């Protein structure tokens, strides 16, 4: 059974749920982006010759319709619009309002997405280039750097001043720094400028709050149209920028961009009608794309190349030689002037400038400029050194040329002077060639000994070589990762090395924990993951450039086992998005994708936000993807309110329809969506096989009513996860309805109610009703709900009714009050301080006892998350032991606890109850503490139920242990536990008697089922026998059993020695005239009280005899002991026989069978009459004060028990090894004697 058991059968996995801090959702700090018209960035269009013929509507319209267009239309129709012609007639340029906001040129080509609270007037037209004079004013000149910053539509960092932007040089940004990885938008400016004058009135309205200045537009950037003003340089720079930047970044672009733009243009006029009626489309099917559109979408990634060379680490038998460079190399003595004024080269990115690297944009300004004194001095020295080096180089060249000429002349002169010598030399050369050819023939037959260093290991054998190579084939992953790093000549990253230390492939999860890696770190890490089978790869919160992102994607695209890729908060631009889509299209094993964006850098462009990505391409890739479909898609942190509803709908439908068989999970935590998206989300959850949707950290206070309606009307058969963590639901009634309808769902396994302190303790009443009704609830969280001790105790008592729970989390509650800190305050009197201390200690002990009881009684519970630093060590160990037993019980159905463990747990439970009984009694006497507190009444009632249950279990355990003792199967340790249980049972009986004798117990804790002031006990897990106050039939009868089962006649003088009379409502004794302690309606029996007094006297005498016997330091002989035990075990033996000693002296004879066993008062009278005393106290007094020996009472039995010292020493010398056995026998005999007496007392009650 254990081999087939899965983790999901025991607990609920939560690795896909979002865990983070709640963000402050104020309007001013909702995001680093502005929430007005600057929500989306302009898509880059291809610069083709045919683009000039495209109408202006194609350029100016947005690529996707925005969800807030109907709101913008209503606002623009309700308020007057200011035309651009009036502005041009006035001849004025709008002045900017602040330095932090600007309008980029790309925004003029898109319709703005305004919020519902927009109250600023709209203008229907933007000032164009024809409206501007030829000579620009100063204000328009200042506006130019804002438009052309890095060639992008707008900057997300709104804190940069205009003066800083105007000082930047375009050529310096091109050659002095690294070009941006994101596509530039400067190429759009000439296109729009050529067509702005044709249909300028068709431009969409913009918000005047965003249009701080008017953006002048230039004419097409040609050589013949350069203006004479300062703006001319700007245009020429822009043209050069478009030529330079369009080459490396347009490789992956195709003409499909124009088609997409045209496709959205066609639906632009009908977007208003679609927004007015959002459900006009079919909600069952995704938007149908034509076949040509599908091909165009896939063409965007057709040219994306994901090939990458991997390293065969297995081929390297040893590490390569290393020469590891320093990460912070020192600057050498030779200084090149260009290094002083230029940025670090790309090869040094992240290595030489790792300490100063704040981002990967290479925006580090040089330390010197061309006008600095140091640069001029270094340049002058460099020129001098260059001239001197050139001079030396020429001199060396001349010397070498002269030497070569002299050598040539010498050879020619030798040949002319001696012709015979030349013939001789030629003959010698031919002979030498023949000899060399013969030597080559012989050398070809020779072989070099392998290995070359065979002499280095003279004692190595072939067997050792085989062992070496076989161990190499099974190398661990840390060796492989270290070798990958050494091949890149770097040291391994410690955070990664710790994760793979001593592990072999395949690896379950690997996280890249370096938030700011260098390029060589990514290269070595990707070399490792490309050759190692890893199921989950996590890159959360890692700053990756586009090149790094491409390396990661290329290394994983051919992985046959990768199942999850985590890219949370990783910057993804347009190029990287296409790489991701191509990866999804080619990889066949990925089923879990995390592209959440819960936080972003302050300098991040709007085009790099997830809501601005090409989601149509993403959906098309999911439709055409081969292999396993996605089962888990995490979109946490996305701004769905900035996306069109059609895109949101298309994503969800595509994700669900591509995987109809397997359950799917969607992450929607910490997002922003409209009510329309929220309604569609819950409809989508009910129609498809949705296992869970993470809604944590969303403000659902205004959407709670909609949620209740959806849960009440729609079926959610497959829903297993429901998270309400940090959802800001404040209404207790709304949460009660949510719990009501969630309890009706058949498959809910996980419920998260964390970070909702405003609902407690009001929600506990509904929780008491609905939590036990969940059919399959396995895990529930109440983290950081600020629960007090009393509320936590009540919650634990409620959760004890949920039989299917396996994991409960109660982390981060209100801090426990410390009793020691109360003494520091001197304002209160000492009495009140002591009372508060006692109350705090009582509350803490009650909570620990409740937690322990909850764990012990919940047999399916395997994990309890609480703040254990405040829990006592003993309780911690008990809880851990119970959880371990529960786990064993789940894994093995035949597992059972041994008898010693059960007895120890029972004794511990009883001790916890008896320790708190005194404090409970004090609070029962004080009616003000419990008069109006329903919670305290409920806890008190649970306390009584618990006491009754423990008392019942103790009695059953005692009966079973006595049965084992009769058959001789009770070991010594269980005999000790039996004695403890007998004392515990007596203590619990006394406590119950005290509580039952209280006259106001019925007022404080109404036991009638008609009382609804707090939850009914009839719903508890305790059996109905406890609810009615009647205990099951037991062999051992206590005082409460006598109350209910024994009928006492009214005229029995032996039971009622005094006559009773009532006087003015008071019950008094006629003989004494004093008021009685109990009312006539009390359940306490006088017969029971008298029997307890007799039992106490016998117990007192037995303890006294045991104490006196222990002073003799003797053991009972085996013969006497056996006869005594045999006599005591027979039920027909006399009860007083153990004290008189006749049974020991006549052990050989058969015990006398009495016709009737004396019990109760007869037994007491018989003992007193035999000893000639009036009470047991007098008997003890005679023995202690009057020196009456026990020999006179028990005869010669004690003399036979105490051997002489000589015999004791001889026995010790003869058998020193038998001493432990003798001691064990002595202890066993003592326990047997005491248990015999207590057994006889128990029999006397029956």
UniProtKB/Swiss-Prot annotation:
Top-rank taxon: Eukaryota
Gene Ontology cellular-component terms listed: cytoplasm; mitochondrion
Modified residues (Phosphoserine): 102, 277, 1013, 1200, 1204, 1207
Family: Belongs to the GIP3/HER1 family.
Location of this chain's protein in the cell: Cytoplasm
Keywords: Cytoplasm, Phosphoprotein
Ranges of Basic and acidic residues composition bias in the record: 271-282
Other facts: Present with 195 molecules/cell in log phase SD medium.
Modified residues (Phosphothreonine): 128, 1130
Family matches, as InterPro entries: LRR_dom_sf
Source organism per UniProt: Saccharomyces cerevisiae (strain ATCC 204508 / S288c) (Baker's yeast)
Polar residues bias (residue ranges): 58-95, 1109-1133, 1200-1215
Function statement: Required for HMG2-induced endoplasmic reticulum-remodeling.
Name of the protein in question: HMG2-induced ER-remodeling protein 1
Disordered: annotated segments: 19-241, 263-288, 816-836, 1109-1157, 1192-1224
Low complexity bias: start-end ranges: 27-41, 154-163, 211-230
One of the protein's GO biological processes: endoplasmic reticulum organization
Gene3D superfamilies: Ribonuclease Inhibitor (3.80.10.10)
């Amino acid at each position: 059974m254990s081999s087939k058991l899965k983790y999901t059968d025991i607990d609920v996995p939560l690795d896909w749920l979002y865990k983070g801090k709640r963000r402050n959702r104020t309007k001013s700090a909702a995001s680093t982006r502005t929430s007005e018209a600057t929500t989306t960035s302009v898509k880059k269009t291809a610069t083709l010759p045919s683009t000039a013929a495209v109408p202006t509507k194609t350029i100016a319209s947005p690529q996707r319709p925005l969800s807030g267009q109907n709101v913008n239309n209503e606002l623009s129709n309700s308020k007057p619009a200011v035309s651009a012609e009036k502005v041009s007639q006035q001849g004025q340029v709008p002045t900017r309002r602040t330095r932090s906001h600007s309008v980029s040129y790309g925004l003029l080509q898109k319709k703005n997405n305004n919020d519902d609270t927009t109250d600023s007037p709209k203008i229907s037209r933007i000032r164009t280039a024809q409206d501007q004079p030829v000579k620009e004013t100063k204000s328009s000149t200042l506006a130019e750097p804002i438009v052309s910053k890095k060639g992008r539509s707008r900057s997300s960092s709104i804190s940069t001043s205009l003066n800083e932007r105007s000082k930047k040089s375009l050529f310096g940004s091109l050659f002095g720094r690294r070009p941006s990885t994101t596509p530039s938008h400067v190429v759009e400016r000439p296109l729009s400028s050529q067509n702005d004058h044709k249909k300028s009135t068709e431009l969409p309205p913009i918000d005047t709050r965003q249009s701080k200045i008017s953006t002048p537009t230039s004419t097409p950037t040609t050589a013949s149209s350069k203006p004479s003003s300062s703006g001319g340089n700007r245009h020429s720079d822009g043209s050069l920028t478009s030529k330079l930047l369009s080459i490396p970044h347009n490789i992956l672009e195709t003409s499909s961009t124009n088609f997409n733009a045209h496709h959205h243009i066609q639906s632009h006029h009908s977007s208003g009608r679609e927004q007015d009626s959002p459900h006009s489309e079919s909600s069952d099917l995704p938007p149908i794309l034509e076949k040509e559109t599908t091909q165009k979408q896939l063409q965007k990634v057709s040219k994306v190349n994901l090939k990458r060379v991997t390293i065969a680490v297995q081929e390297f038998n040893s590490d390569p030689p290393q020469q590891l460079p320093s990460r912070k190399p020192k600057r050498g003595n030779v200084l090149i002037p260009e290094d002083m004024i230029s940025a670090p080269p790309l090869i040094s990115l992240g290595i030489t400038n790792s300490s100063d690297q704040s981002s990967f944009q290479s925006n580090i300004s040089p330390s010197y400029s061309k006008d600095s004194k140091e640069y001029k001095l270094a340049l002058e020295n460099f020129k001098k050194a260059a001239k001197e080096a050139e001079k030396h180089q020429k001199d060396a060249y001349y010397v070498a040329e002269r030497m070569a000429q002299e050598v040539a002349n010498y050879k020619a002169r030798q040949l002319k002077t001696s012709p015979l010598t030349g013939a001789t030399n030629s003959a010698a050369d031919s002979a030498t060639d023949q000899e060399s050819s013969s030597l080559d023939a012989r050398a070809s037959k020779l072989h070099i000994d392998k290995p070359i260093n065979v002499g280095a290991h003279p004692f190595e054998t072939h067997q050792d070589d085989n062992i070496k190579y076989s161990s190499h084939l099974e190398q661990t992953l840390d060796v492989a990762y270290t070798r990958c790093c050494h091949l890149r000549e770097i040291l391994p990253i410690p955070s990664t090395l710790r994760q793979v230390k001593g592990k072999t492939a395949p690896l379950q999860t690997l996280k890249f924990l370096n938030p700011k890696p260098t390029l060589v770190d990514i290269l070595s890490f990707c070399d490792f993951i490309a050759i190692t089978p890893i199921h989950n790869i996590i890159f959360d919160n890692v700053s990756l450039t586009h090149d790094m992102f491409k390396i990661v994607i290329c290394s994983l695209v051919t992985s046959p086992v990768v199942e999850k890729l985590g890219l949370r908060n990783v910057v993804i631009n347009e190029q990287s998005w296409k790489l991701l889509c191509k990866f999804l299209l080619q990889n066949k094993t990925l089923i879990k994708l995390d592209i959440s964006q819960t936080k972003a850098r302050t300098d991040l462009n709007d085009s790099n936000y997830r809501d601005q990505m090409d989601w149509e391409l993403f959906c098309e890739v999911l439709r055409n993807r081969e292999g396993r479909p996605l089962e888990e898609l995490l979109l946490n942190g996305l701004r769905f309110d900035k996306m069109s509803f059609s895109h949101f709908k298309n994503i969800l439908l595509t994700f669900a329809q591509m995987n109809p068989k397997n359950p799917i999970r969607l992450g929607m935590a910490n997002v922003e969506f409209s009510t329309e998206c929220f309604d569609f989300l819950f409809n989508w959850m009910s129609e498809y096989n949705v296992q869970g949707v993470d809604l944590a950290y969303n403000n659902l206070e205004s959407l709670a009513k909609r949620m209740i309606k959806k849960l009440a009307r729609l079926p959610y058969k497959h829903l297993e996860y429901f998270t309400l963590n940090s959802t800001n639901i404040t209404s207790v009634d709304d949460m009660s309805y949510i719990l009501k309808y969630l309890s009706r769902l058949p498959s809910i396994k996980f419920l998260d109610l964390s970070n909702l302190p405003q609902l407690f303790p009001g929600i506990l009443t509904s929780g008491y009703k609905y939590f036990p009704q969940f059919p399959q609830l396995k895990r529930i969280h109440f983290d950081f709900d600020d629960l007090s001790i009393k509320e936590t105790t009540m919650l634990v008592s409620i959760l004890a009714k949920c039989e299917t729970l396996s994991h409960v989390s109660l982390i981060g509650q209100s801090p426990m009050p410390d009793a020691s800190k109360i003494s520091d305050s001197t304002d209160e009197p000492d009495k009140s301080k002591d009372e508060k201390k006692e109350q705090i200690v009582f509350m803490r002990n009650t909570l620990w006892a409740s937690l322990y009881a909850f764990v012990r009684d919940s047999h399916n519970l395997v994990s309890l998350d609480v703040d254990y630093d405040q829990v006592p060590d003993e309780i911690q160990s008990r809880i851990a032991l119970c959880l371990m037993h529960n786990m064993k019980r789940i894994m093995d159905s035949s597992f059972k606890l041994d008898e010693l463990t059960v007895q120890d747990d029972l004794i511990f439970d009883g001790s916890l109850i008896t320790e708190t009984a005194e404090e409970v009694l004090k609070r029962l006497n004080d009616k003000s503490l419990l008069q109006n507190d329903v919670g305290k009444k409920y806890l008190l009632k649970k306390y009584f139920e618990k006491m009754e249950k423990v008392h019942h279990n103790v009695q059953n355990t005692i009966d079973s242990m006595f049965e084992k003792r009769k058959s001789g199967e009770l070991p010594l340790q269980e005999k000790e536990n039996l004695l403890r249980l007998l004392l515990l049972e007596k203590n619990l009986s006394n406590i119950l008697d005290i509580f039952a004798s209280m006259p106001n117990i019925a007022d404080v804790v109404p036991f009638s089922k008609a009382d609804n002031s707090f939850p009914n006990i009839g719903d508890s897990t305790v059996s109905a026998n406890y609810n009615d106050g009647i205990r099951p039939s037991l062999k051992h009868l206590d005082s409460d059993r006598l109350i209910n089962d024994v009928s006492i006649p009214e005229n029995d003088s032996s039971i009622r020695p005094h006559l009773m009379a009532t006087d003015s409502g008071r019950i008094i004794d006629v003989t004494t005239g004093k008021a009685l302690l109990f009312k006539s309606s009390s359940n306490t029996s006088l017969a029971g009280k008298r029997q307890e007094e007799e039992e106490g006297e016998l117990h007192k005498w037995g303890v006294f005899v045991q104490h006196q016997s222990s002073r003799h330091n003797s053991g009972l002989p085996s013969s006497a002991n056996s006869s005594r035990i045999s006599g005591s075990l027979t039920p027909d033996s006399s009860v007083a026989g153990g004290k008189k000693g006749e049974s020991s002296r006549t052990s050989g004879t058969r015990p006398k069978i009495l016709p009737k066993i004396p019990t109760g008062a007869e037994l007491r009278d018989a003992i007193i009459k035999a000893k000639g005393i009036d009470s047991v106290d007098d008997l003890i007094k005679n023995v202690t004060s009057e020196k009456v020996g026990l020999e006179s009472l028990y005869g010669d039995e004690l003399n036979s028990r105490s051997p002489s010292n000589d015999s004791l020493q001889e026995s010790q010398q003869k058998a020193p090894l038998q001493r432990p056995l003798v001691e064990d026998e002595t202890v066993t005999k003592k326990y047997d004697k005491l248990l015999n007496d207590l057994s006889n007392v128990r029999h006397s009650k029956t």
